[in-house]
A protein has these predicted regions:
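N-terminal secretory signal peptides that target proteins for export/translocation
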Residues: 1-9
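Bacterial N-terminal signal peptides
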Residues: 10-23
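Noncatalytic, solvent-exposed loop/strand surfaces
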Residues: 26-228
């Protein structure tokens, strides 16, 4: 799929520096910038001897990827969310690029459906790379949670909208999946049945290998409003 649309809000140009390409073999633990804001999710790198400054006018390569996602990188592959098309043809896409050359290696797209997301607010979360296998996880604004191998083979996907009832992400603010041992954890505002009937922001934990639900939780009390 060729992405040709760009906008002042959504056109993202990736500035790639030499130190982002990592060549660790997949048989070894995966190293890199594996999740939103890095290894400790605090925006800092554990790498040594990094450049003091980066010249934005001299990138190794650029790629036009509409969206507000940020890239994750491992073993020479860069993964990022974006979107393509308009109206009923709009799809959110996860794209894998060669971190050294910017060449597109693979891409998967999911159509939007029953979403209250405003245009240009798609693809706000980041993919997450599982450190043991290099598998990649994504969460879309339409409620799709999906897992892929580093080479782009789909392991599983799940439509949370269809399984867990009404689902929304205010202003398109989806979660970047979190890997915790054997679980992949995400969240969304849902309304279903029984204890999870009332609308609320809930966490969902799935088996990272199969996509089967392990637990769901609605922490804290529902917000209240008082008028005096």
């Amino acid at each position: 799929m060729k992405i040709s649309r760009s906008s002042a809000v959504g056109a993202l140009s990736l500035l790639v520096c030499p130190f982002v390409a990592l060549s660790t073999a997949l048989s070894q633990p995966v190293h890199g910038w594996l999740s939103w804001r890095g290894p400790n999710q605090n925006g800092t790198s554990l790498e040594k001897n990094l450049p003091d400054k980066i010249d934005a006018n001299k990138p190794l390569w650029t790629a036009d990827l509409p969206g507000q996602s940020t890239p994750v990188i491992a073993n020479g592959h860069l993964y990022i969310l974006g979107y393509a098309g308009e109206g009923p043809d709009l799809q959110e896409v996860i794209t894998c690029l060669d971190a050294e050359t910017g060449k597109q290696l693979w891409q998967h797209g999911y159509s939007d459906f029953l979403s209250d997301t405003i245009y240009h607010r798609y693809a706000t979360s980041s993919p997450t790379i599982e450190p043991e296998t290099g598998n990649v996880y994504m969460q879309g604004t339409q409620g799709i949670l999906a897992a892929f191998t580093a080479d782009g083979a789909k392991l599983w996907d799940l439509s949370m909208m269809e399984v867990y009832g009404r689902l929304t992400f205010p202003n398109g603010r989806t979660a970047s999946p979190l890997i915790d041992r054997d679980l992949v954890i995400t969240r969304g505002i849902t309304a279903n049945w029984g204890a999870h009937g009332p609308g609320g922001d809930r966490f969902y934990a799935f088996d990272k290998k199969t996509g089967e639900l392990v637990w769901a939780s609605a922490p804290g009390d529902r917000p209240t409003c008082s008028v005096s």
